[in-house]
Every structure is written in C-alpha cells, then in structure tokens.
A protein has these predicted regions:
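N-terminal cap/lid segment of alpha/beta-hydrolase-fold proteins
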Residues: 29-56
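Short, surface-exposed "cap/lid" segments of acyl-processing enzymes
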Residues: 55-57, 61-92
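Alpha/beta-hydrolase active-site loop
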Residues: 84, 117-138
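Conserved alpha/beta-hydrolase
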Residues: 84-111
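Primarily recognizes the serine-hydrolase "nucleophile elbow" in alpha/beta-hydrolase
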Residues: 134-189
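Accessory cap/linker subdomain of secreted extracellular hydrolases
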Residues: 170-241
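Short beta-strand/loop motif that positions the catalytic acidic residue
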Residues: 246, 252-254
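Catalytic active-site module of serine/aspartate enzymes centered on a nucleophile-bearing elbow/loop
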Residues: 287, 293-330
C-alpha cells in the first residue's frame, strides 16, 4: 500500500501549532524590556522600556496612565488589575514600535517621589511627561516620539506635547469637557439631593481655587482635604482647549461601550481639532476590551488581565503611527 505524503488535518494542526510557538519565541527574543528612570525635583520615577530589535531607529510611544494611583501597567487598586497599558506596549512592540510606560509619582516604584498626595498637581504630571519625552527624544535608538494618553492621561499628553518634543499624539478615551462639569454630572446621577447640594458647594469653592475643610463623611472619598490641591489644579483644565492647540498629527480613539467617557467626548475633541483623526471602536469599553454595553456586565473586564485588548485598538494606533511618520517626512 503506497504511503500517503499529503498532510492530514491532524498533521496540519500540529505543524501550525509548531510554527505558532516558533514565531512566538522568535518575537519574544527580539523584544527587550529594560528599566528606565527619570530624576525629578522630588525624587526618582521608574518605568519600563520595551524595545523591538532593529538595526535602525524606531518610533517610541510614551504611555501616560489615567487618573488616580494607576501604575505603569494600567493597574489601579480601586480600578482593577487588567494590565491594559502593559498589553498595549506589547502590541506596539510586536509591530516594531518601542514604548515607555512608567509609575506616576507617588505610585508603586515611584512612591517616594511625592508620597504625600497634597503635593500632587496636574502641572507636576505634565512636567513628568515632558521630562520622559525629552529623555526619549535624546535616545539615538528612537526616531520619533508619540505621546499616548489614556483617559486623564490624554489630557496630560495634550498639555505636555509641545515641550516634550512630541511628533504625534494619541488620545484613548480622553475627556473633552471641563473637569468640573464632568464631576458635577457624574455626582448628579449618584447622590441624593442633600449630598448633591453639599458636593456642589465644595466643587464651586474648589473651582475658585479655595480649599474646603468642612467635607461630610460620605464625600470624603472624593473631596478629602488632602486631595483638594490636586483637584484645584485639575479643575483649571479644559481638555478640549488643550487638544485644540496641538500642532502635531493626532488620533482620537474612543470605545462605543465606554461607560466612563462617552463617545460625545471624542466628537467634541474632533470639533476642537478638525485635523485630528477619529477612530470609534464598536464594543470597546474604558479599559480597552470588547464587552457588552451594560455597566454591570463590564465590571469583570476591569479585573481580568487575561482578557485581550480590542484588536482594532492596536490596528488603529499602529496605522496612525506609521502614517504620521509620512506626514512628518520620516
């Protein structure tokens, strides 16, 4: 009986599995993760640099985390462990784009830089992003700097773009409304009338730049005296205005199922800066995963690092970074 030399389905599956494993190992061996630090006036910040192997300079993305004590990987004690920024860095590296993600001052490895939240401010976060960006711009391994901000990090990216020397910017789930307006709208949906009136009194005072010592216990988590200096600095900001003055290529990425930053924010950013590209990703939520629309059905994704990022997210960002190189003539 002649021997059949045609591969059987089982053989094909085994071959494909082997090729997948070999390809994965090859990719892993050509991507290096290196520690990087930035000295500031209040201590040292620490981050992770992910660099794909290349004989020529590559683009580098500075990943800027969102609000609260969010670490370099996108994890937050209150907001879940989902590795969103770590996974985004890996996607970029597989596509030949380096990235730096870092622990914000007062967080994780950077905890000794401004350990007291009374000394935090938007301006300090912006200065940090500028410092990281300038450090990356001086590195001969990289030819372009792209700021990639998530949520509040998108505002920081817009404010830091000019002095960091950024060549392009990506806003993921970036807010557009003045922060005081956003806070008031969120509280109006959650607080009973008496507490809402108290919160509006405190908010109005903070908007005027005046701290409030008298904060009722139910509102301490948001308006505790130690966080008020930071809130005052945040309430000064108008994200749409900051985005409007960008003079570099910009991409707005927004998920259709984002329960924290609605699609209307992306539309306002686009109106503020008509030259920016807009990518709406159906089904993507605030932590960059594809989920159902109801909030209760999204909660698990905030604490699931195994859940993959929305595929379209990486595709849009990689395509933009490559096309912005052509706009910059590089």
């Amino acid at each position: 009986m002649p021997v059949c030399h045609y591969p059987t389905p089982i053989m094909l599956r085994a071959l494909l599995l082997s090729l997948t494993l070999i390809t994965g190992l090859a990719q892993a061996s050509t991507i290096r993760q290196l520690p990087l630090s930035l000295d500031t006036d209040q201590g040292t910040l620490y981050g992770s640099l992910l660099v794909p192997q290349s004989d020529t300079p590559v683009p580098v993305a500075l990943l800027i985390a969102g609000s609260g004590p969010t670490d370099r990987d996108g994890n937050n004690p209150a907001g879940g462990h989902n590795d969103a920024l770590k996974k985004l860095a890996q996607v970029l590296a597989r596509n030949g784009i380096a990235s730096l993600r870092y622990d914000k001052r007062g967080v994780a490895a950077s905890s000794q830089a401004t350990p007291d939240e009374r000394n935090l401010s938007v301006e300090r976060y912006v200065t940090d992003a500028e410092g990281w960006g300038q450090q990356l711009k001086r590195d001969p391994r990289f030819d372009r700097l792209i700021l990639v901000g998530h949520s509040e990090g998108a505002l920081i990216a817009s404010l830091a773009a000019a002095r960091s020397g950024a060549d392009a910017l990506v806003s993921i789930a970036g807010p557009a409304y003045p922060i005081g307006q956003v806070l008031d709208a969120q509280l109006a949906m959650r607080l009973p009338p008496a507490q809402l009136a108290q919160s509006r009194r405190i908010l109005a005072s903070l908007i005027r730049g005046q701290e409030q010592a008298d904060v009722p216990e139910p509102l301490q988590v948001l308006f505790r005296p130690s966080v008020q200096p930071y809130l005052i600095s945040l309430l000064r900001q108008n994200p749409a205005e900051a985005f409007a003055v960008l003079e570099i290529p910009a991409l707005i990425v927004q998920g259709g199922h984002d329960a924290q930053v609605g699609v209307d924010n992306a539309e306002i950013l686009k109106q503020a800066n008509p030259d920016a590209e807009l990518a709406l990703i159906p089904g993507m939520n605030h932590v960059m995963r594809i989920t159902p629309l109801p909030w209760q059905e999204q909660l698990a994704s905030y604490n699931d690092p195994q859940l993959p990022l929305a595929r379209a997210l990486g595709e849009h960002i990689v395509r933009f970074i490559r096309s912005s190189a052509e706009q910059n003539g590089r």
